[in-house]
UniProtKB/Swiss-Prot annotation:
<keyword id="KW-0408">Iron</keyword>
<dbReference type="GO" id="GO:0020037">
    <property type="term" value="F:heme binding"/>
</dbReference>
<dbReference type="GO" id="GO:0008203">
    <property type="term" value="P:cholesterol metabolic process"/>
</dbReference>
<dbReference type="GO" id="GO:0016020">
    <property type="term" value="C:membrane"/>
</dbReference>
<keyword id="KW-0479">Metal-binding</keyword>
<dbReference type="InterPro" id="IPR002401">
    <property type="entry name" value="Cyt_P450_E_grp-I"/>
</dbReference>
<dbReference type="InterPro" id="IPR001128">
    <property type="entry name" value="Cyt_P450"/>
</dbReference>
<dbReference type="InterPro" id="IPR036396">
    <property type="entry name" value="Cyt_P450_sf"/>
</dbReference>
<dbReference type="GO" id="GO:0006694">
    <property type="term" value="P:steroid biosynthetic process"/>
</dbReference>
<feature type="binding site" description="axial binding residue">
    <location>
        <position position="462"/>
    </location>
    <ligand>
        <name>heme</name>
    </ligand>
</feature>
<keyword id="KW-1207">Sterol metabolism</keyword>
<protein>
    <recommendedName>
        <fullName>Cytochrome P450 CYP82J17</fullName>
        <ecNumber>1.14.14.-</ecNumber>
    </recommendedName>
</protein>
<keyword id="KW-0812">Transmembrane</keyword>
<dbReference type="Pfam" id="PF00067">
    <property type="entry name" value="p450"/>
</dbReference>
<keyword id="KW-0560">Oxidoreductase</keyword>
<keyword id="KW-0472">Membrane</keyword>
<dbReference type="GO" id="GO:0016135">
    <property type="term" value="P:saponin biosynthetic process"/>
</dbReference>
Length: 523
């Protein structure tokens, strides 16, 4: 956001604000649906820029919107440049949006992000609601991320976790050793996702940071994508700037990153096409996701997207959704356990009780590790994958909580605020995995419907949630089973968050690791 406000746009705005004020005026609602109350709206909107001037600081947008909700209520309207935007953070509004009005609110906004990083909105995450989106969503759910497909790829993430554990044991060996564990989590999740997508892994865990940066250009690109995905492109909210050919630093960076990404993923697709043409792949060989997409995705003349473009768009989508988000969640789990050592001890005792100390944990064991599952759920409550949802757009006029919402209104769900609502959660700022365990000692899956949304809700809910939680559970379980974790002497665990799309930990997480099981279990 700072990069947006730091541009010399203010000069342009000062000159144009009087002449072009009428362009900014709120569009009149259609006469056929003028029912309902007027939405609470923030004060101090300015011509052309709306309320953008209230967002220009280092506070994450979800937290800024939460402070607005404290003043205006859990459903309010803010104007982002030329566009009215609805922000909701209570379960009643969320239920109405994603049940009664789910279809109306299932579309995405047209954006520079979708054009450049989504290959002109060709991925399932950013395509507008309609026939093309439904087609790609079906392919994703049935072919790429179905329970059958995830199970067929289980060997990928289990073998990668085995490799990480082995290399960690070589690094730690005996005694306490300081490890920047957040970097290991990043390499783990990126190796898993690229191996699933294209059959390649990019890192050995014992590489130093300089080697990673030199050899892992794709990782650097993904990090840049995650950063700029949380930034506004000026012309997306003030269209007049596009007419004058204005390009800010965010747009310039986005164009560069999209070119570099296309070169990498385009090469992956070409390699798979060549192998297929040469008859290298056969029905008995384990297929990666590019193989699958090449076999099920076709050109789509109606949307103007050819097969390879659709595949590349969804490769990028899968990498963004499956790498940085998962490693961030695992890092926050370890942060919270280090700050709550009794919870870490209880989790280790649960594992020792059910698995023992003479064999490694298998995926089939996770169902018996109730407290571990509760730890993951509680971490996702405090640190949801997307604290602020990717914006939706209303395709028709509708009513939400008695308020009139006109067609074209954009919608944010403030998950961060919802998950810390004191009317829902007892001591919402406290880390308490027990809140997700019912009186029978089982995970409570029923009590928090429309109150707990770590992976979204409705038609646009994250299709990869099952895969992500499986990886998180087994990786964290293996780590805390095999190692004791401590904070380095004279250090505290810094809880500061970044300001990007997923609010990752601002500083790397350093821990002291000590092996706790027989040597052969690390091999």
């Amino acid at each position: 956001m700072d990069s947006f406000l730091s541009q010399p746009i203010t000069i342009v705005l000062a000159i144009l604000s009087v002449l072009l004020y009428n362009i900014w005026k709120i569009r009149k609602p259609s006469n056929k649906f003028q029912k309902g109350m007027k939405l609470p709206q923030l004060s101090f909107a300015l011509p052309l820029i709306g309320h953008l001037h209230l967002l220009g600081n280092q506070i994450p947008l979800a937290k800024t919107f939460a402070s607005f909700a404290d003043k205006y209520g859990p459903i309010f309207q803010i104007r982002l440049g030329a566009y009215p935007t609805l922000v909701i953070s209570n379960k009643e509004a969320i239920k109405e949006c994603f049940t009664t009005n789910d279809k109306i609110l299932a579309s995405r906004t047209k954006s520079t992000h979708g054009i450049l990083l989504g290959y002109n909105h060709a991925s399932f995450a950013c395509a507008p609601y309609g026939r093309f989106w439904a087609k790609i969503r079906k392919v994703t759910m049935l072919e790429l991320l179905s329970s059958r497909r995830v199970e067929s790829l289980r060997h990928v993430y289990e073998s990668e976790i085995d490799t990480l554990v082995k290399d960690l044991s070589l690094y730690v060996k005996v005694g306490k050793v300081e490890v920047v564990i957040s970097e290991w989590m990043e390499r783990l999740t990126f190796n898993i996702i690229t191996k699933m997508i294209c059959g390649k892994r990019y890192f050995e865990y014992l590489q130093d940071v300089d080697d990673v940066e030199a050899n892992g250009n794709i990782v650097k690109l993904i990090k840049e994508v995650m950063h700029i995905s949380g930034e506004l492109v000026p012309k997306d909210v003030i269209p007049i700037l596009g007419w004058f050919g204005f390009e800010g630093e965010v747009l310039k960076s986005m164009k560069r990153v999209s070119r570099d990404l296309d070169e990498v993923v385009g090469k992956w697709v070409e390699e798979h096409i060549e192998k297929s043409d040469d008859g290298v792949n056969n029905s008995n060989e384990k297929q990666d996701l590019i193989d699958v997409m090449l076999s099920v995705i076709e050109d789509d003349p109606d949307s103007g997207n050819d097969r390879d473009t659709i595949i590349k768009a969804n490769i990028v989508n899968l990498m963004i959704a499956g790498s940085d988000t998962t490693s961030t969640t695992m890092t926050w789990i370890l942060v919270l356990l280090l700050n709550n050592m009794n919870a870490l001890k209880r989790a280790q005792e649960e594992i020792d009780q059910h698995i023992g100390r003479d064999r490694k944990i298998e995926s089939s064991d996770i169902k018996n590790l109730v407290y571990l599952q509760a730890i993951v759920k509680e971490t996702l409550r405090l640190h949801p994958t997307l604290p602020l949802s990717i914006p939706h757009e209303a395709t028709e006029d509708c009513n939400i909580q008695g308020y009139y919402v006109p067609k074209g209104t954009r919608l944010f769900t403030n998950v961060w605020k919802l998950h810390r609502d004191p009317s829902i959660w007892l001591e919402p700022e406290k880390f308490s995995p027990e809140r997700f365990i019912n009186e029978n000692g089982e995970i409570d899956h029923e009590s928090h419907q429309f109150e707990y949304l770590p992976f979204g809700l409705g038609r646009r809910a994250c299709p990869g949630s099952m895969f992500a939680t499986q990886v998180i559970h087994i990786a964290v379980a293996r780590l805390i089973h095999l190692f004791d974790f401590e904070v380095p002497i004279n250090e505290v665990v810094d809880m500061k968050q970044g300001t990007g799309l997923i609010l990752s930990k601002f500083t790397p997480l350093k821990v002291l690791l000590t092996p706790r099981l027989p040597y052969e279990l690390y091999q």
